[in-house]
């Protein structure tokens, strides 16, 4: 959103504020917060749903209950990054009609409700409710920057990570 110089400054700031070298996965972030290793962390939202709905007495449930999750928004755009998934049918697919039917089902209300309920994903259909755990995080404001624009800068972003030694 703000160019390479500010991206580098931001990345250096994140690195400077790391409690330890970045490692592990989304559940590890919650574990580290609960363990006092760090005060905040970044994780995919659906892990919050998995942890908060884990079986009572498990580490995952303890981690989920021990964190306060928020949906961050960027001041300039008023939105937050969301991961996306895509699907396509190959031009020469031998069973094209069935492939299209599968894709149509995947975006249907029943399938989207299943994704929301079973995996705490954000439905692509506005008329499908989010899981209550996800709703409790507040409204989702999606960063409007098109993925094609983000993709244009992937190589530069990777080079910045190397330049600031983020993984060292």
Describe each region flagged by the PLM.
Residues 12, 27, 31, 35, ...:
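Solvent-exposed, polar/charged alpha-helical surfaces in well-ordered, non-transmembrane soluble domains
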Residues 16-19, 34, 38, 53-56, ...:
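Sec-exported extracytoplasmic/periplasmic mature domains
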Residues 45-49, 74-77, 93-94, 108, ...:
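Solvent-exposed loop/turn segments at secondary-structure junctions
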Residues 62-93:
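Flexible, solvent-exposed loop/hinge segments that line or gate ligand/substrate-binding clefts
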Residues 1-72:
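Ligand-binding pocket segment of bilobal, Venus flytrap-like solute-binding proteins
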Residues 130-168:
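Extracellular/periplasmic bilobal clamshell ligand-binding domains
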Residues 5, 24-27, 42, 92-97, ...:
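Soluble non-cytosolic domains of exported or imported proteins
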Residues 85-145:
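Mature extracytoplasmic/periplasmic domains
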């Amino acid at each position: 959103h703000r160019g390479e110089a500010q991206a580098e400054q931001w990345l250096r700031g994140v690195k400077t504020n790391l409690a330890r070298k970045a490692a592990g996965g989304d559940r590890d972030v919650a574990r580290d917060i609960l363990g006092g290793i760090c005060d905040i962390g970044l994780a995919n939202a659906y892990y919050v749903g998995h942890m908060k709905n884990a079986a009572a007495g498990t580490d995952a449930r303890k981690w989920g209950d021990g964190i306060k999750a928020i949906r961050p928004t960027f001041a300039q755009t008023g939105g937050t990054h969301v991961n996306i998934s895509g699907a396509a049918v190959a031009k020469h697919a031998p069973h094209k009609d069935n492939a299209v039917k599968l894709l149509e089902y995947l975006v249907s209300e029943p399938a989207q409700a299943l994704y929301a309920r079973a995996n705490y994903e954000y439905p692509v259909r506005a008329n499908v409710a989010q899981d209550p755990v996800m709703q409790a995080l507040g409204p989702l404001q999606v960063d409007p920057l098109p993925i094609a624009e983000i993709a244009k800068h992937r190589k530069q972003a990777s080079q910045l990570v190397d330049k600031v030694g983020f993984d060292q």
